[in-house]
Swiss-Prot record:
Gene: pulA
Annotated lipid attachment (N-palmitoyl cysteine): 20
InterPro entries per record: Carb-bd-like_fold, CBM41_pullulanase, Glyco_hydro_13_cat_dom, Glyco_hydro_13_N, Glyco_hydro_b, Glycoside_hydrolase_SF, Ig-like_fold, Ig_E-set
Protein name: Pullulanase
Keywords: Cell membrane, Glycosidase, Hydrolase, Lipoprotein, Membrane, Palmitate, Signal
Predominant location category: membrane
Transmembrane segments: none
Topology of the protein relative to the lipid bilayer: Lipid-anchor
Length: 1090
């Protein structure tokens, strides 16, 4: 074990580099801290270094863009399309004229010279910072968002380079960097190998290194830092397998005497030059590969965070590139009570320090001294622990905590078990998942104690409308609650005095958000009204031309308590804003109390939505950047050329393909599984994870709970060049589930990215496609039949090998049914498919029906459309999934993406009075292009009221009761589905809108699964007129007892079964017809030969 201080590391680096020198075996009497005199010195081309074009004066900032192409071109460059996107936020608000719309490209250069354009930016103050994105049109020239902090650049005059996220103090610095070190296209992939296309066939290729500053040309244009000579080699098979997207790069070998351990603690730059030393190219080096190669094996064996054991506390953090790490301990009032240097383990790259048991409950942070390639500086800052299990308010400090402390457990916690088994495929197939958000559950429920609304403990309010409603759903067959993100999130302020929710006085909003005082709503600051009351006033005159509700709600969103939570800050701590006290351990016990209430009182298992595909932020300056401050450029997925953090997910993409982040994910899941008794995990954007990493994590967690279930969004992420992604098709046969977009789109109509008239044109099976067209509908009969095929396939669990008769009368496997160029069927078992027609993403089902339904469809018809759509999920094979409030006709007033639309647009009313329809135009930034369509359709039908909400709730319970009434609805096994499930009314002459699924339990199917039945029929009539089935002549079918009991309130009300077996289905109806079993198993409803 070696402990380095920063000074020791600097000294060590000089010894290292004088030893490894330039790779030459000859001795040298020259200065050991400079390259050998006999080697060619690399230098810049002979181009004059620029001064500033302009400098900022009072209340101004200046940004120069240094343009290398323009400098070296013989003709004048055109900068007319270059522009800045500028915005204020809570932490950076110095702009006097932010840009309101991303499509506004009017902030063009104030001027230019031969070195590039510049912008003079007006400020409202000379302190703080500004947010900047440099663009060409609306295309980013620099992938990362830039923050210019005036504390760092006191003259407020800076320079940037396209493709480089660094901000430079002067044009001279940026010029040298641009002509010197640009991009980050070299990859150090293992201890011996560097990959770099820029070095191919170049006479001189070197790896330069600096431990204390950036590698750059000096005042004479020369590169005088230490370096290693690199020699050409070939890409090994192992490297090619680990980094397939880099396998075509030129490969170089490092000298055998290179000290990797110390080289990684400073800046490394790959440089290629001509024989005479004139620089050809220079680039920063990405080091994630070598970090894994050098440290991961030893590091994976260790535990991290603050661990209580053996009468003390061990603090451990993995920070192999850090020059120094200290544990800084704080008292409850956040005063420093000690700073302790940590010891570095050279094998693992981990730093640790052992403290006493008196530190239990103490707050702490890590003080880092580490080189960060984004700033190209050795940074010093404090950062919270990524392995923290408890936090202070607003996640500013980590806290030492023992999760096994009995004081943090509700009574009976240790004996808590899951109410629904998850051991077998048949168990999993019974899952009916109710996706919920903590605030949506109780923020509006007046029967929940005021102090618990929007909190974990609202689920313990047993007499509340919300809890009673969930109990009713549970009794009818809903088995699981899925909680949208409940880990520590970055986008809700936990300091209550900084927050204003719409239930509070408008004056409070004005206090916490100064922008309101200068807005069109300033007059309400002294009104005495609540924000909600003002919104209710505004909605009366809200329109596409005057969308006041969304304008005010946008201001509310800046300081309210609402966010979906897909903004991970600390992965393994419950979110504090949902606790009655966000400080310290209260959140832990209250979270556990909620889990206990859901399992014991509601009788449901708990699934947790996890978001490991991105972090909220990255870089050395953002408050919510954690991992990237500790091991810079390791935990984030970087662009292979620029080194910028990718943002394909939404935010700062993470890199689960790197071993130590894969470990962090598995360690985090283990805590949620063992310490919080979570029964399943839903992975956000799972396609951004490697399949191997997801499978490895599952195996790790199954060792703790063999019955755990994994599923997620298996959309194609376009990361297949890097690794085999965890996508729908790739996960076939693994047992891991993925959401199916096939049934979703066929039933809802269109796709999730439709906008404008396309939202109305593209009807689905559930909204009248082919049977009740609206005025814009343009689907052909063939297209309607194809939608029906996709719906049938979805009801059969989207199995790749399921054989069905398609729209043309041909027998096809599921994998041969087209879905936008991809296989319609992709799964091996129905438990690998999660079917849905509504979840938190995109518009609610009610809003989509409102977009698409014909004006002829009255309110009663639309309620039944909702039920018919949900029936395809609830009565089909596969796992059933639904969004909270679908049973209440939930509307978000046409909002496509309500992640930050607050309590106003996300309201769920458990008093069953209001479904939140037509409460104002949705956010203009997302839905502005839909305003004209919304205006046309929103008044086509009356707003649902109590009668409609009660009716839909009854329909919903009918469907869930039917689902749990027979194991034939939940077969679980792919071979069983193919042996038992079939469809009638198929082919080219089918009756449009009519779906008829049979499930056999007769002798040909094998052993009887339901002793009551020889088979059943699911008949869905998604049409405005009755349909007649003649396929069951001679069969003694009878309506399900559940639907018979429901009588005139049933979705099957009016179904007629003639003596000869002919079945007549009324419009917009759902019927489950049972074939009773006699004294012995009968012939059943066998699958037809195809």
């Amino acid at each position: 074990m070696l402990r380095y201080t920063r000074n020791a590391l600097v000294l060590g680096s000089l010894v290292l580099l004088s030893g490894c020198d330039n790779g030459s075996s000859s001795s040298s009497s020259g200065n050991p801290d400079t390259p050998d005199n006999q080697d060619v010195v690399v230098r810049l081309p002979d181009v004059a270094v620029p001064g500033e074009a302009v400098t900022a004066v009072e209340n101004q900032a200046v940004i120069h863009l240094v343009d290398i192409a323009g400098i070296t071109s013989s003709s004048a460059a055109d900068y007319s399309s270059k522009n800045l996107y500028l915005w204020n936020n809570e932490t950076c608000d110095a702009l006097s004229a932010p840009v309101a719309d991303w499509n506004d490209v009017s902030t063009t250069p104030s001027g230019s010279d031969k070195y590039g354009p510049y912008w003079v930016i007006p400020l409202n103050k000379e302190s703080g910072c500004i947010n900047v994105i440099v663009r060409d049109g609306t295309d980013k020239l620099i992938d990362s968002d830039l923050r210019v902090a005036f504390g760092d650049f006191t003259d407020r005059t800076v320079s940037v380079i396209a493709g480089n996220s660094a901000v430079y103090d002067s044009r001279a610095d940026a010029f040298r960097a641009a002509f010197g070190v640009a991009l980050a296209e070299a990859h150090w992939v293992d201890k011996n190998t560097l990959l770099w296309p820029g070095g191919q066939d170049k006479p001189i290729v070197r790896l330069y290194y600096s431990h204390s500053s950036k590698v750059a040309a000096d005042g004479e244009g020369k590169f005088t830092d230490r370096y290693l000579k690199l020699t050409p080699t070939t890409v090994s098979q192992q490297v090619s397998m680990r980094f397939p997207h880099l396998s075509s790069y030129a490969a170089f070998k490092l000298p055998d005497n290179a000290n990797v351990d110390e080289l990684l603690q400073g800046e490394t730059v790959a440089i290629a030059a001509a024989e005479d030393g004139i620089l050809i190219s220079a680039t920063q080096v990405q080091t994630a590969g070598v970090l894994d190669d050098a440290y991961a094996e030893a590091a994976e064996a260790l535990s991290y965070g603050a661990q209580l054991a053996d009468g003390g506390v061990t603090f451990r953090v993995w920070a192999p590139t850090a020059q120094q790490v200290d544990v800084v301990v704080y008292s409850a009032d956040k005063k420093v009570i000690g700073s302790h240097p940590m010891t570095r383990d050279s094998a693992s790259g981990a730093w640790s320090w052992q403290g006493g048991s008196d530190l239990k409950g103490a707050f702490y942070r890590y003080a880092m001294t580490v080189y960060h390639p984004q700033s190209r500086k050795v940074e010093q800052y404090e950062v919270t622990d990524p392995y923290a299990h408890s936090l202070s308010t607003n996640s500013e400090y980590s806290q030492v905590v023992d999760l096994n402390d009995s004081a943090l457990k509700p009574d009976g916690w240790d004996n808590l078990t899951m109410p629904h088994a998850q051991k077998t495929k048949a168990d999993l197939a019974k899952m009916t998942i109710h996706e919920s958000h903590i605030r949506d559950l109780s923020a509006w429920d007046q029967t929940v104690p005021a102090e618990l609304r929007g909190k974990y403990l609202a689920l313990t309010a047993g007499d509340s409308n919300m809890v009673q409603h969930l109990k009713t759903l549970s009794a009818s067959g809903v088995t699981h609650v899925e909680l949208l993100p409940v880990f520590d999130l970055a986008t809700v302020n936990e300091f209550s005095d900084k927050v204003a929710d719409i239930q509070q006085p408008f004056s409070r909003l004005c206090e916490v958000n100064s922008a309101v005082k200068s807005s069109e709503f300033a007059g309400y600051c002294d009104s005495g009204s609540t924000v909600e009351e003002v919104l209710n006033q505004l909605k009366q005159s809200d329109s596409q031309d005057n969308p006041q509700v969304q304008a005010l709600n946008t201001l509310v969103a800046q300081t309210d308590s609402y966010n979906w939570g897909y903004d991970p800050f600390h992965y393994t701590v419950p979110e504090g804003s949902y606790a009655t006290d966000p400080e310290g351990t209260t959140r832990i016990k209250e979270f556990r109390t909620m889990i206990q209430a859901i399992k014991q009182d509601l009788g449901m298992n708990v699934i947790m939505d996890v978001v490991y595909n991105h972090t909220n932020a990255a870089g050395p300056t953002d408050r919510t950047s954690v991992l990237d401050k500790i091991v810079p450029w390791y935990y984030q997925r970087l662009n292979e050329t620029t080194g910028s953090v990718e943002s394909a997910t939404c935010c700062s993409d993470s890199a689960p393909e790197h071993r130590m982040f894969a470990k962090l994910i598995a360690d985090s899941l283990a805590v949620w599984t063992t310490d919080y008794k979570i029964d399943g995990f839903r992975f956000d954007l799972m396609g951004y994870h490697p399949k191997a990493q997801i499978l490895s994590a599952w195996e790790r967690i199954k060792a703790l709970n063999p019955d755990i279930y994994f599923f997620g969004e298996g959309w194609d992420s376009n990361q297949s060049d890097r690794f085999e992604i965890a996508s729908q098709i790739n996960l076939k046969g693994t047992g891991i589930g993925t959401f199916s977009d096939r049934l979703r789109d066929s039933v809802r109509g269109g796709g999730p990215f439709d906008s404008g008239d396309a939202l109305r044109q593209n009807q689905g099976i559930g909204s009248g496609a082919g049977v009740l067209p609206n005025e814009l509908a343009s689907l052909s009969d063939d297209q309607v039949r194809h939608l029906a095929d996709l719906t049938r396939l979805g009801m059969a669990g989207n199995l790749a090998d399921f054989v069905m008769i398609d729209k043309d009368g041909a027998a096809k496997k599921g994998s041969e049914i087209d879905y936008n160029g991809a296989p319609g069927g992709y799964a091996a078992d129905p438990t690998e498919v999660v079917n849905y027609v509504s979840k938190h993403d995109n518009q609610t089902l009610w809003d989509m029906i409102s977009y698409k339904a014909s004006q002829e469809a009255d309110l009663a018809t639309r309620v039944r459309m909702q039920a018919v759509s949900l029936a395809t999920v609830m009565l089909g094979q596969g796992i059933a999934f639904d969004q909270q409030g679908s049973e209440l006709l939930r509307s978000k007033s046409f909002t496509r993406d309500s992640y930050d639309s607050g309590d106003w647009f996300n309201r769920v009313d458990y008093s069953l009075q209001d479904n939140n329809y037509n409460v104002g135009m949705p956010r203009i930034s997302d839905d502005g292009s839909n305003y004209e369509v919304i205006t046309r359709v929103k008044e086509m039908v009356a707003t649902p009221g109590e009668a409609e909400l009660k009716q839909m709730t009854a329909f919903y319970q009918e469907l869930t009761e039917l689902r749990k009434s027979s194991p034939l609805f939940t077969l679980g096994d792919g071979s069983a589905v193919m042996k038992r499930v079939d469809f009638r009314n198929t082919g080219s002459d089918q009756q449009a809108g009519l779906l008829v699924m049979t499930v056999d339990d007769g002798m040909k199917a094998g052993a009887s699964l339901d002793s009551r039945l020889d088979g059943l029929v699911v008949a869905i009539n998604a049409a405005p007129e009755s349909r007649t089935l003649n396929e069951f002549a001679g069969e003694t079918l009878q309506l399900s007892a559940i639907q018979q009991t429901a009588g005139e309130n049933s979705l099957a009300n009016g179904v007629q079964i003639a003596a000869d077996g002919t079945v007549t289905l009324p419009a917009w109806s759902v019927a489950v017809l049972e074939l009773p079993q006699g004294e012995a198993q009968g012939a059943g409803l066998p699958v037809s030969s195809k």
